[in-house]
């Protein structure tokens, strides 16, 4: 079924081609037989129909001139679209060669037919068509769908490689070819230095679109992918700026000599053109984001605002002789960040696919016209110039790659390996940019323009067909380091947490890196820009908003891939139940927020900055003390309410634990000591009679309990032992002891007969009493030491 459909689409291509040729012949016939005034005014056809009153109404007329330009453009776009459809019908073909190879082949076949039938190809490309209509959609799509975070994490290496690498390649190739042209045997003496430098600037413009497709399929590591992507994004802009400056030098050199001041002015213009283009793009991006803030009720015009303002940034920059490519790139990156949060989901889908469609159509037309231009008489062949051009392109790319990355690896945490550098060198595929710049050279300034076009076509064909086809097997053969699996929402959230943590650590250590810059920009963005440019500035956490955005993105991807196609929609009952939920009014929400603010405990905030020079040393100590006091107050309140514990254990459980106390609770031991009942014949030689506890009676008076507590230390003092801290309250002040005693008075005591049944005898011997007191002393010594070692206040200086 696949080959049959492929042949059917190929047949449609030939029929469309015959229709184009037939219309071209009809054009010549109509031009000879029609009224000459029809070519002078746009409404000549209507004037001609009413000029002769004796002429009757014709049933059938042919006026191809009236629809020639849109008709031919539509046929070319349709031919390119059918070629892409036929290319993807055969599933093995996209894995064998890039899509650009097929488009060039189709264009070469169409060009051969046009050349064989002695017809002139339609003017698909000239200076205004390329720079004003074909190039902006390609650059806009690349900038809008650029992965922002990896790009700005590697922005230093990308600018170092894309900027300086383009200059090294341009001047290296130009100077090398100039020395070759000085050899008289090659017959290239009429090509001066400026012409060679201009050719070097246009031939250094790379177009690794096919390489990026191979990288996405092979899932190479993120650093390697971003270096190629950044080169594809910025290299065209730098090459076009250098191309325009050298054309201006060529025009100047035709009438006067170039001085050192002119060279300095050219360097200054190079910087101003690039920075000015970026500034214009950011300004237009902010304006478009601000306008989309008010389009919630008219979402149909949101895609129009995005496309019009991006195109206006390009035109405004070109009006002031700035870089339109860098302007539309900066505008796309700015709109991606802010406009997406203002537009609806339907508008976002429309923007996404319409932008990809325009970019695909532009690239397809350029590649097809490249194939059409291959067959013709506008070529000049010189073996020396073409072969040395191909050789110097490879040599200078290798020099620039291995030299610049050797320097950048000295400052990178994760350096590029030799395999990565070789893949970057092999990815220098020339494409539509180089051919378009060569084709648009003015013939009056460059008499050897045909030679430049031929050399550009040879380099483009070699890199697209040879390097573009073999890059995939080479990546698999070298086993280039692959990227990890796609980050989940949890990993993305934790990466943001680590960014904040690293920024704080760097500030404390006095270091400075991109984490600090990113953190400061986020603060400025959240404080000023988002309040002005974003429609709904809700006071919610950035992590919550990021989670919502990632969830929405993941759901859209699942729907687009068909994963959710089999999932059933919610039942009508569920939808009615959801709709029937009462929504809270803003007043109710505000009152709930006030209640929670007053009632909930809020830990005092830490100092806002992490700077080591203004960090207060006593803040954390006060916080710890305050939290400990609050926990003790909570414990006292719970003990005043009775012995019923909140987690459902019986009142006499021994080993329960509060947060502010050590693990061995001294209160349980004190209850055991109070439960002990000494006998009358105790034999003790102390100066008082110890109190007797009745197991079935409740607690005695306050004076009796104080005397009972004083028995224990007096016994140990008489034995000659060293006085120690026997209870938890011995480490507290007099006021705290008074508080504990007041608490003991108010606290209800448990019924001892409900706790233990082994005390029903009502009597105990002296040995049993001594054993109980010894066990109570050991437990209190252990609990006191444990409390001292774990107290947060005792460890601070």
UniProtKB/Swiss-Prot annotation:
GO terms for molecular function: sodium:proton antiporter activity. It is found in: Basolateral cell membrane; Apical cell membrane; Zymogen granule membrane. Keywords: Antiport, Cell membrane, Cytoplasmic vesicle, Glycoprotein, Ion transport, Membrane, Phosphoprotein, Sodium, Sodium transport, Transmembrane, Transmembrane helix, Transport. Expressed in kidney. Expressed in uterus and endometrial epithelial cells. Expressed in the inner segments of inner medullary collecting ducts (IMCD) in kidney. Expressed in AGTR1-positive neurons in organum vasculosum of the lamina terminalis (at protein level). It holds the Pfam family Na_H_Exchanger. Residues 783-797 have a biased composition (Basic residues). Residues 759-769 have a biased composition (Acidic residues). It catalyses: Na(+)(in) + H(+)(out) = Na(+)(out) + H(+)(in); Na(+)(out) + NH4(+)(in) = Na(+)(in) + NH4(+)(out). Residues 115-127, 176-194, 248-270, 326-352, 406-420, 442-450 are extracellular. Residues 14-28, 70-90, 421-441 dip into the membrane without crossing it. One of its GO terms (biological process) is transepithelial ammonium transport. Disruption phenotype: Mice are born at the expected Mendelian rate. They display lack of renal adaptation to metabolic acidosis marked by impaired medullary ammonia accumulation and inability to increase urinary net acid excretion to recover from acidosis. They show major morphological changes in the gastric mucosa associated with decreased numbers of gastric parietal cells and hypochlorhydria. GO terms for cellular component: apical plasma membrane; basolateral plasma membrane; zymogen granule membrane. It is a multi-pass membrane protein. The chain crosses the membrane at residues 95-114, 128-148, 155-175, 195-215, 227-247, 271-291, 305-325, 353-373, 385-405, 451-471. Residues 32-52, 759-797 are annotated as: Disordered. Electroneutral antiporter that exchanges sodium for protons or ammonium ions at the basolateral membrane of epithelia to regulate cell volume and intracellular pH upon hypertonic conditions. As part of transcellular ammonia transport in renal tubules, mediates basolateral ammonium extrusion in the medullary thick ascending limb, regulating the corticopapillary ammonium gradient and overall renal acid excretion. Mediates sodium:proton exchange in gastric parietal cells secondary to cAMP-dependent acid secretion and hyperosmolarity. NCBIfam families: b_cpa1. This is Sodium/hydrogen exchanger 4. It comes from Mus musculus (Mouse). The gene is Slc9a4.
């Amino acid at each position: 079924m696949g080959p049959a459909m492929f042949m059917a689409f190929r047949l449609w291509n030939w029929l469309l081609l015959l229709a184009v040729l037939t219309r071209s012949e009809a054009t010549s016939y109509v031009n000879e037989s029609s009224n000459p005034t029809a070519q002078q005014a746009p409404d000549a056809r209507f004037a001609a129909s009413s000029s002769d009153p004796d002429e009757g109404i014709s049933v059938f007329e042919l006026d191809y001139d009236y629809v020639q330009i849109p008709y031919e453009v539509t046929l070319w776009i349709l031919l390119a679209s059918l070629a892409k459809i036929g290319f993807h019908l055969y599933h093995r073909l996209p894995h064998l060669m890039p899509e650009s190879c097929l488009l060039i082949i189709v264009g070469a076949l169409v060009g051969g037919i046009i050349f064989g039938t002695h017809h002139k190809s339609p003017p698909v490309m000239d200076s205004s068509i390329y720079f004003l209509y074909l190039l902006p959609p390609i650059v806009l799509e690349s900038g809008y769908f650029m992965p922002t975070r990896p790009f700005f994490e590697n922005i230093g290496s990308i600018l170092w490689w894309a900027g300086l690498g383009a200059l090294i390649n341009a001047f290296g190739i130009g100077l090398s070819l100039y020395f070759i042209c000085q050899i008289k045997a090659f017959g290239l003496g009429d090509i001066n230095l400026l012409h060679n430098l201009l050719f070097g600037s246009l031939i250094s413009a790379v177009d690794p679109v096919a390489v990026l497709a191979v990288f996405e399929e092979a899932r190479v590591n993120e650093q390697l992918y971003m270096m190629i992507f950044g080169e594809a994004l910025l290299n065209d802009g730098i090459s076009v700026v250098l191309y325009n400056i050298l054309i201006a030098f060529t025009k100047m050199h035709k009438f006067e000599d170039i001085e050192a001041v002119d060279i300095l002015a050219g360097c200054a213009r190079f910087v101003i053109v690039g920075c000015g283009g970026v500034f214009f793009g950011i300004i237009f991006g902010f304006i478009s984001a601000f306008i989309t803030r008010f389009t919630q009720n008219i979402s149909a015009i949101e895609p129009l605002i995005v496309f019009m303002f991006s195109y206006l940034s390009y035109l405004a920059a070109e009006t002031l002789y700035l870089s339109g490519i860098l302007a539309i790139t900066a505008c796309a990156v700015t709109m991606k960040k802010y406009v997406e949060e203002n537009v609806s989901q339907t508008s976002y889908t429309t923007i996404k696919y319409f932008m990809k469609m325009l970019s695909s159509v532009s690239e397809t037309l350029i590649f097809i016209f490249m194939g059409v231009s291959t067959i013709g008489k506008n070529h000049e062949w010189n073996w020396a110039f073409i072969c040395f051009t191909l050789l110097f392109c490879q040599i200078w790319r290798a020099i620039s790659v291995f030299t610049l990355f050797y320097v950048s690896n000295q400052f990178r945490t994760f350096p590029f390996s030799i395999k990565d550098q070789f893949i970057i060198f092999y990815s220098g595929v020339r494409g539509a940019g180089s051919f378009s710049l060569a084709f648009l050279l003015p013939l009056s300034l460059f008499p050897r323009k045909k030679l430049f076009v031929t050399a550009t076509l040879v380099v483009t064909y070699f890199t697209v067909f040879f390097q573009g086809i073999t890059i995939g097997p080479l990546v698999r053969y070298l086993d280039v380091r692959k990227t990890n699996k796609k980050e989940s929402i949890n990993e993305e959230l934790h990466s943001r947490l680590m960014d904040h943590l690293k920024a704080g650590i760097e500030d404390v250590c006095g270091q400075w890196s991109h984490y600090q810059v990113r953190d400061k920009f986020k603060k400025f963005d959240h404080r000023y820009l988002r309040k002005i440019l974003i429609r709904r500035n809700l006071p919610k956490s950035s992590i919550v908003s990021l989670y919502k955005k990632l969830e929405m993105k993941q759901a859209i991807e699942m729907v687009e891939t068909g994963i959710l196609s089999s999932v059933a929609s919610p039942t009508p009952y569920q939808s009615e139940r959801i709709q029937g939920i009462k929504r809270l009014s803003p007043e109710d929400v505000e009152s709930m927020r006030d209640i929670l603010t007053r009632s909930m405990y809020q830990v005092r905030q830490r100092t806002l900055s992490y700077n080591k020079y203004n960090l207060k040393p006593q803040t954390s100590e006060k916080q710890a003390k305050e939290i400990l006091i609050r926990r003790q107050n909570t414990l006292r309140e719970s003990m005043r309410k009775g012995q019923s514990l909140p987690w459902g254990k019986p009142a006499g459980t021994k080993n329960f634990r509060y947060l502010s106390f050590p693990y061995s609770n001294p209160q349980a031991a004190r209850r055991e000591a109070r439960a002990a009942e000494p006998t009358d014949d105790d034999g003790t030689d102390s100066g008082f009679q110890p109190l007797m506890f009745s197991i079935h009676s409740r607690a005695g008076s306050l004076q009796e309990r104080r005397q009972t507590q004083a028995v224990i230390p007096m016994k140990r003092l008489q034995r000659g032992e060293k006085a120690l801290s026997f209870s938890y309250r011995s480490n507290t002040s007099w006021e705290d002891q008074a508080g504990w005693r007041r608490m003991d008075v108010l606290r209800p005591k448990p019924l001892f007969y409900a706790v233990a049944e082994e005390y029903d005898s009502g009597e105990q011997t002296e040995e049993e009493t001594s054993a109980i007191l010894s066990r109570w002393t050991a437990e209190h010594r252990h609990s006191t030491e444990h409390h001292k070692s774990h107290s947060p206040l005792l460890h601070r200086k």
